[in-house]
A protein has these predicted regions:
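Alpha-helix-centered segments that form part of catalytic cores
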Residues: 179-209
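Ligand-site clamp/hinge motif
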Residues: 191-195, 222-235
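Surface-exposed binding/hinge segments that line
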Residues: 108-181, 210
Length: 235
């Protein structure tokens, strides 16, 4: 063990590292937070929500039983290839949670009050969640881990249908061969374990994943969060 290494003994293997399809607690609580990020997360001292990918907690508007939550992404936030994290990545991530052919049963109930996401052509860092009013809506929507569309859907297959169609479980989607091909790949063990495919905006990248032996992550050089490292505990 070198001075810049930390070795942690786990009682069991992580089942995978796909934030949508992997449900085991070890992966979700101890490994994935190093690789993936969300709009918001919890301050471990106060247990209040604090911004991570978002610039701030959302502005919330209520209209009867409908709520709208406005978020804006941090301008510093980028993926490993240097491209900015945008509204397209947010919408894509939520489409994977609602796509009927994706193994997403562990996540879908936590956001089943969502009706749609509004995007803004003049500002690709701004989004508005439109949902049924729900007491846990800010943390439910804000803490879902965001995926890079360019890695997980390079052909932009899920863009064929709007998010509202995925939420409504539109029959056209269920019968679409391209969506089925996407889902089969997204559900695969390779996408949950291959270091070239397990990609997020967090401070660490997956180096190797050997069942029964070790899982190695490495801190990224020139990580985007280093630019705002005094913002909060997540940087």
């Amino acid at each position: 063990v070198y001075k810049d290494q930390v070795v942690i003994h786990g009682l069991s293997d992580a089942k995978g590292l796909n934030p949508v399809t992997t449900s085991d607690a070890y992966a979700n609580e101890y490994i994935m937070p190093n690789i993936f990020q969300s709009l918001l997360s919890y301050d471990h001292q106060t247990m209040g929500l604090i911004p991570v990918l978002a610039k701030a907690r959302p502005t919330v508007r209520l209209n009867g039983d409908v709520a709208e939550l406005d978020f804006e992404l941090r301008p510093e936030a980028t993926w490993d290839n240097g491209t900015p994290i945008t509204a397209d990545d947010i919408v894509f991530s939520f489409k994977t949670v609602f796509c009927s052919m994706v193994n997403n049963d562990n996540l879908k109930p936590s956001v089943d009050y969502l009706k749609d996401i509004k995007t803004y052509p003049d500002n690709n860092r701004k989004i508005t969640f439109i949902c049924n009013k729900y007491i846990g809506m800010e943390d439910g929507l804000g803490t879902l881990r965001i995926l890079p569309e360019y890695v997980y859907d390079p052909q932009k297959v899920l863009r064929k249908y709007p998010l509202s169609n995925y939420i409504a479980a539109n029959h056209s989607i269920a019968n679409d061969a391209a969506i089925k091909t996407f889902a089969d790949n997204f559900n695969s063990e390779k996408v949950a374990r291959d270091s070239s495919l397990v990609k997020g905006s967090g401070a660490y990248r997956l180096i190797s994943f050997e069942t029964g032996q070790r899982l190695i992550v490495e801190r990224k050089a020139n990580w985007w969060g280093d630019k705002i490292n005094k913002e909060n505990e997540y940087f």
